[in-house]
Amino acid sequence: MISSLHRPTVATVDLQAIRDNIKAVQEHISSTTKTFAVVKANAYGHGAIQVAKAVDEEVDAFCVSNLDEALELRQAGIEKDILILGVILANEIPLAIEHSITITVASNEWLESAKACQKDLAQLHVHVKVDSGMGRIGVRSLEEANQLIAGLTKSGAHVDGIFTHFATADEENTDKFHQQLAFFTDLVNALAIKPELVHASNSATSLWHSDTIFNAVRLGIVIYGLNPSGKTLNLPYPLKPALSLSSRLVHIKKIKAGNTVGYGATYTAKTEEYVGTLPIGYADGWTRDMQGYSVIIDGHLCEIIGRVSMDQLTVRLPKAFDIGQEVTLIGQEGHQMISATDIAEKRGTINYEVLCLLSDRIPRHYIN
């Protein structure tokens, strides 16, 4: 998709904020801990290539979701280790080997299919995934893990790491977290062959359970300056949100009492009022459920009225602003602030989704 470079809606990404957030976490964990920066899903909407280049000196490796995301980084000149967190198809192994990309292996069945496609796994680097209770992918017993590591080693693959993922590290109730931690710890301690890298800590674990870190962490939402728990748990130290979203008024009019606005005529003016139009809509990731929420204009919270359209939305104005007046959708203006977490609360979702849904139509502008 082509970014709309000639439309005044833009996401500004502060790369120094991302670097500062990484350093903030690193200051609170052991200096010997390896840091993996998670840049999957286009770096949570921030731009994978630009973020990876900006933090290359601060981290030891990168995590992505799939082979295409890994290849994108390699083609952009990223040389550090890249771990694919998802499972790739066995016929994609040659590409992973060619580009020195580490893959996740999650089952003995996958290994059998891999050996059927690729007899020699001598140049393949892998991490073994353990399902300690997340319920998605991974081996679920010590027997499976030992069998898989032995089979991979016998086939010539380099088993560089073993890892798991916690389902509830960002919640107040820690029972499930400690169940998963105990399962994974016991399994790792009992392995016949123990890989060098052992990691279980995502952003939430690194923040609130730093005493449970093994020897590597996978930092995702935290490096972009957001709280993984939303508003459930307080951050143990400050983070800097890296992304702001702004637009400009492109049309302003005065409407009379009784006039309607938008699809379905869902908004009817009760009095004479000013209405402004912004060039952003649900095709940009500003979803229809944002009707009734606010944006910031000149320090004023201005309500979104009428339904959000594909490419435009309308807001009620306190006065007749000039065409081109800047509008803040995510970020701070004066004493007013709207965060991705605030928007997530309005939508009944999580801040991750708010950022990931910002489409490629919105150009990213990088500072610092």
UniProtKB/Swiss-Prot annotation:
Pathway: Amino-acid biosynthesis; D-alanine biosynthesis; D-alanine from L-alanine: step 1/1. GO terms for biological process: D-alanine biosynthetic process; peptidoglycan biosynthetic process. Substrate binds at residues 136, 310. Its EC number is 5.1.1.1. InterPro entries: Ala_racemase, Ala_racemase/Decarboxylase_C, Ala_racemase_C, Ala_racemase_N, Ala_racemase_pyridoxalP-BS, PLP-binding_barrel. It catalyses: L-alanine = D-alanine. Gene3D superfamilies: Alanine racemase, Lyase, Ornithine Decarboxylase, Chain A, domain 1. GO terms for cellular component: cytosol. Keywords: Isomerase, Pyridoxal phosphate. The modification N6-(pyridoxal phosphate)lysine is found at residue 40. SMART domains: Ala_racemase_C. Its cofactor is pyridoxal 5'-phosphate. SUPFAM superfamilies: Alanine racemase C-terminal domain-like (SSF50621), PLP-binding barrel (SSF51419). Transmembrane segments: none annotated. HAMAP family: Ala_racemase. This is Alanine racemase.
